[in-house]
Amino acid sequence: MTTILKHLPVGQRIGIAFSGGLDTSAALLWMRQKGAVPYAYTANLGQPDEEDYDAIPRRAMEYGAENARLIDCRKQLVAEGIAAIQCGAFHNTTGGLTYFNTTPLGRAVTGTMLVAAMKEDGVNIWGDGSTYKGNDIERFYRYGLLTNAELQIYKPWLDTDFIDELGGRHEMSEFMTACGFDYKMSVEKAYSTDSNMLGATHEAKDLEYLNSSVKIVNPIMGVKFWDESVKIPAEEVTVRFEQGHPVALNGKTFSDDVEMMLEANRIGGRHGLGMSDQIENRIIEAKSRGIYEAPGMALLHIAYERLLTGIHNEDTIEQYHAHGRQLGRLLYQGRWFDSQALMLRDSLQRWVASQITGEVTLELRRGNDYSILNTISNNLTYKPERLTMEKGDSVFSPDDRIGQLTMRNLDITDTREKLFGYAKTGLLSSSAASGVPQVENLENKAK
């Protein structure tokens, strides 16, 4: 059976991930007119720029959907977001600022929950708005087929018949109007935005050019912290974790994690926390650029890692970072539920996150400017009395340190001999100033 259909399967049920925007509206109406039987599925991901979710399925029915369903994905999305924080599943960083993989997390949830809903309705063909140059086409492909082994893929934007008739937004708008729907195109922004409760992605158009900065973006989850006319008073916030799970903000507990994440977004968003500008590698190895918002994820991540560094030893922290980056890449590639990812997730959640209990108090200022004011945990292995510079009882003595220095550094003689051996072969140059052979200065090599 062919997995990817290049042309519209006339007379068959097709499930379309329906956002209510111009693209999916025109696609749904076109498919119905051409003889397919479209079913519309809309994911409620807590998108901060969506005002009326219930209206979206109603519009789908007006455009010819056989049936339209709104699938509440918020609880599962937040659960996956917290899991990503527990595992440090983030691999794109620039200058210490992190992209929290909020779009990949959203695709993992959407790609499984919508296809599961389609399967309930006997719909085994799926279409969405992803293009062939992006990451989402592969993410949705993988998650869809993981959920339904019988699934076939039909994407209008890979169908030459659809492209020839409705290849651009102007053509789609005219098509909708000609069919009796007063669909006016929204004002074109200088970039494209995709969002869910965990974060927002701004990319494409003017943002494809690196001389266009964050200053052209209107944040939808935060504030323009770079604009000095925007008043942003400093604010203290306390985050509490229990066994790796965020349970309270400023002493307030929440009935569910969705409400907790919304409050974290509000707190971080007041300062523009978690906004970053990243150049990344897409799945196809071409580089792209995005500007991201994730105020709640950033707030929880900062507090989590503060507790992490105070609780776990150096080797555990090193494995957390290494495995977290590896897991972040798998998440980015649409492999969040693959066995290699589950293995890493289980290890990090079981042996790292389970010990993260305590409170961190932060002072948030503008953007990603913050200070850590206090860290409290019964699990801290940070013991200031072990290293105090004051006179008093000590857990080890000067004689203990002499023994440690002797035993820990028995290889100094071997290292010295190797360095002079490298110098004899020309790999290193002798240094009269330091007495130790060193790599020759690049400027000297150029001469």
From Swiss-Prot:
Pfam families assigned to the protein according to its UniProt record, in alphabetical order: Arginosuc_syn_C, Arginosuc_synth
SUPFAM superfamilies membership: Adenine nucleotide alpha hydrolases-like (SSF52402), Argininosuccinate synthetase, C-terminal domain (SSF69864)
NCBIfam families, alphabetized: argG, PRK05370.1
Domain of life: Bacteria
A GO molecular-function descriptor: ATP binding
Places the protein is found: Cytoplasm
Any single GO CC term annotated in Swiss-Prot or TrEMBL for this entry: cytoplasm
Similarity remark: Belongs to the argininosuccinate synthase family. Type 2 subfamily.
Keywords for the protein's UniProt record, in alphabetical order: Amino-acid biosynthesis, Arginine biosynthesis, ATP-binding, Cytoplasm, Ligase, Nucleotide-binding
Subunit and partners: Homotetramer.
Pathway the protein takes part in: Amino-acid biosynthesis; L-arginine biosynthesis; L-arginine from L-ornithine and carbamoyl phosphate: step 2/3
Annotated organism of origin: Escherichia fergusonii (strain ATCC 35469 / DSM 13698 / CCUG 18766 / IAM 14443 / JCM 21226 / LMG 7866 / NBRC 102419 / NCTC 12128 / CDC 0568-73)
Reactions this protein catalyses: L-citrulline + L-aspartate + ATP = 2-(N(omega)-L-arginino)succinate + AMP + diphosphate + H(+)
Protein name: Argininosuccinate synthase
Binding annotation for ATP: 17-25, 43, 129, 131, 136, 194
Chief location of this protein within or outside the cell: cytoplasm
PROSITE patterns linked: ARGININOSUCCIN_SYN_1, ARGININOSUCCIN_SYN_2
EC number(s) recorded for this UniProt protein: 6.3.4.5
